[in-house]
Amino acid sequence: MRDRMERLVVLPFSIGCISVSSVAVLSPLSKPHHHHSRQVIREQEEEDNMKNVFKFLAVSKPEISIGINRIFKSFKTISQLFADKDEEKEEVETSGMEIGVPTNVKHVSHIGWESGLTAATGPGKGWEDLIPPELLAAAASKKEINPHLHPTL
């Protein structure tokens, strides 16, 4: 229970948009040094003492932003927990197919040359259709036909 109590963060009513990387635009003006009476000096000392007391009670800005980020993350994780359970139930109900089990899926298309190359013609057959007839005629006229390209000539 103590672990949970340490995680609670008290949020102030107004949160500014000051971050660690912000830069002050104006610097505080220095007060002119005048001769102060003893009463004014005592009042300033009392104010300084009160400021020191409130410094212990105040939460620094990086700690506030860390607390807010933790709260947002906890909301996200809670919503993800509920969303995952709903999706898992739907997947179990709708999917009747398991990975790795043979199915009755048929192969309907081939990648690559489709014109004369099919499994029925076998390997090495149908390559003649890939060579344009103009090149075959030019090669036949010069009698420089490669026997591997056109074995019938």
UniProtKB/Swiss-Prot annotation:
Induction profile: By the root-colonizing endophytic fungus P.indica.
PROSITE patterns per the UniProt record, alphabetical: CRIB
Tissue: Expressed in roots, leaves, stems, flowers, siliques and pollen.
Membrane topology: Peripheral membrane protein
Domain of life of the native organism: Eukaryota
Keyword list, A-Z: Cell membrane, Developmental protein, Growth regulation, Membrane
Localisation per UniProt entry: Cell membrane
GO CC aspect terms: apical plasma membrane; plasma membrane
Designated name of the protein: CRIB domain-containing protein RIC4
Organism encoding this protein: Arabidopsis thaliana
